Regions:
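Pyridoxal 5′-phosphate
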Residues: 1-155
């Protein structure tokens, strides 16, 4: 299920969709590729079984990210070497992780933390709250640069 339209920006109510789907015993996979650059998805709050997006959409390397509920991941067949059977998440990562790209994730974290420190010196909330506040700053900046175009197109 698409979390957010990449054309018009409509954010779908993934929590409600998950609730309705789970009533019918369906598994919900959230596609966050268009949402993640503009928000910080709380996958547990959304109630999805899986959530995925590309990290290059959020200032990172060209690497896919997959969240999955452990009780479902444990039931999936092994895609890796036989000696890794039952060792989630390695069972889903044939060939192993790309260490070079994974190391780039430190830069994404540092970028967000530096933005937070610059705009909120001395504050020390949770990492989730820091990222949320930085995303709000980015969203405000996006509005500032997009509004002239939107005004032009609608007038």
């Amino acid at each position: 299920v698409t979390h957010c339209s990449n054309i018009v920006g409509t954010v779908n109510n993934l929590k409600k969709i998950s609730e309705l789907a789970h009533e019918k015993n369906a598994i919900v996979i959230g596609d966050g590729v268009s949402f993640a650059p503009h928000g910080f998805p709380d996958v547990k709050e959304l109630g999805v079984d899986f959530y995925t997006f590309s990290l290059y959409k959020t200032y990172g390397p060209h690497l896919g990210l997959l969240y999955g509920k452990k009780e479902i991941l444990d039931k999936l067949p092994n895609q890796n070497h036989e000696f890794l059977e039952g060792d989630v998440p390695y069972t889903l990562n044939p060939g192993g992780p790309n260490h070079e790209e994974l190391s780039c994730l430190v830069g994404v974290y540092e970028y967000f933390m530096n933005l937070f420190e610059h705009h909120y010196p001395g504050e020390n909330p949770s990492i989730r709250e820091k990222i949320h506040k930085v995303n709000e700053l980015i969203a405000e900046h996006e509005k500032e640069i997009a509004n002239p175009l939107l005004d032009y197109l609608t007038n």
